[in-house]
């Protein structure tokens, strides 16, 4: 193949980048994730029905404003849900956005009780798992006296007041149930 080929527009395009010495590597998306995380690469998601055109930096003159060699693509925006994004990338992207947007709920009386009792149960019984701990804590909560329960309800009211000061516009909005297939 010639290193230059004429297009109908009459401008030469170099195909030197097709030379085997050019750093053309096949990457699995999962393998490329490290390069993306370290800032040595970028991820671009291509929706169904589109084909990406990759041009090495040495050929970037093809994209300058005066060049009529390639058709100019029109910008189209897609949501992540419209793109076929590998789950491990999508999960980390959603995790990053949710962590800044989501406001935590204030703990209720049982949650405060469970948090305190969970650690003590695990210390006294290191071989039990979380589901067993949950069952035991639930039983313990039901058997607690009114005075003990009142103490946790008062603690939860304190945390609720603190929460209102920190997040004045907060309103709990439960997730809608997804329809099971």
Swiss-Prot record:
Would you say which domain of life the source belongs to? Eukaryota
| CDD domains registered for this protein in UniProt | HMG-box_ROX1-like
Q: Any idea where this protein resides?
A: Nucleus
Q: What are the GO BP annotations of this UniProt entry?
A: cell differentiation
Is DNA-binding one of the keywords UniProt gives this record?
Answer: yes
Q: What UniProt keywords apply to this chain's record, in alphabetical order?
A: DNA-binding, Nucleus, Transcription, Transcription regulation
The ranges the UniProt entry gives for DNA binding are: 103-171
GO MF entry, a single one: RNA polymerase II cis-regulatory region sequence-specific DNA binding
- Pfam families per record: HMG_box
Q: Is Nucleus found in the keyword set?
A: yes
The main location is nucleus
Q: Which Gene3D superfamilies match?
A: High mobility group box domain (1.10.30.10)
**What's one GO-annotated cellular component?**
nucleus
Miscellaneous: There are three genetic loci for mating type genes in fission yeast, mat1, mat2-P and mat3-M. Cell type is determined by the alternate allele present in mat1, either P (plus) in a h+ or M (minus) in a h- cell. Mat2-P and mat3-M serve as donor of information that is transposed to mat1 during a switch of mating type.
Q: What does this protein do?
A: Mating type proteins are sequence specific DNA-binding proteins that act as master switches in yeast differentiation by controlling gene expression in a cell type-specific fashion. Positive regulator of MFM genes. The HMG box recognizes the DNA sequence 5'-AACAAAG-3'. Required for conjugation and efficient meiosis.
Q: What is this protein called?
A: Mating-type M-specific polypeptide Mc
Q: Which organism is it from?
A: Schizosaccharomyces kambucha (Fission yeast)
Q: Which gene encodes it?
A: matMc
């Amino acid at each position: 193949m010639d290193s230059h080929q004429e297009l109908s527009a009459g401008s030469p395009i170099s195909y030197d980048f097709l030379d085997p010495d050019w750093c053309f590597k096949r990457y699995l998306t999962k393998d490329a994730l490290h390069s993306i995380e370290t800032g040595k690469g970028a991820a671009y998601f291509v929706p169904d029905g589109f084909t990406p055109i990759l041009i090495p930096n040495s050929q970037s003159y093809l994209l300058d404003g005066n060049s009529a060699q390639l058709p100019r693509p029109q910008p189209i925006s897609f949501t992540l849900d419209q793109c076929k994004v590998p789950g491990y990338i999508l999960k980390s992207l959603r995790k990053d956005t949710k962590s800044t947007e989501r406001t935590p709920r204030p703990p209720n009386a049982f949650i405060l009780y469970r948090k305190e009792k969970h650690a003590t149960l695990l210390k006294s019984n290191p071989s039990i798992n979380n589901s067993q701990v949950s069952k035991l804590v639930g039983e313990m909560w039901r058997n607690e006296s009114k005075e003990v329960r009142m103490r946790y309800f008062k603690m939860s009211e304190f945390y609720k007041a603190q929460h209102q000061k920190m997040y004045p516009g907060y309103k709990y909005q439960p997730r809608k149930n997804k329809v099971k297939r």
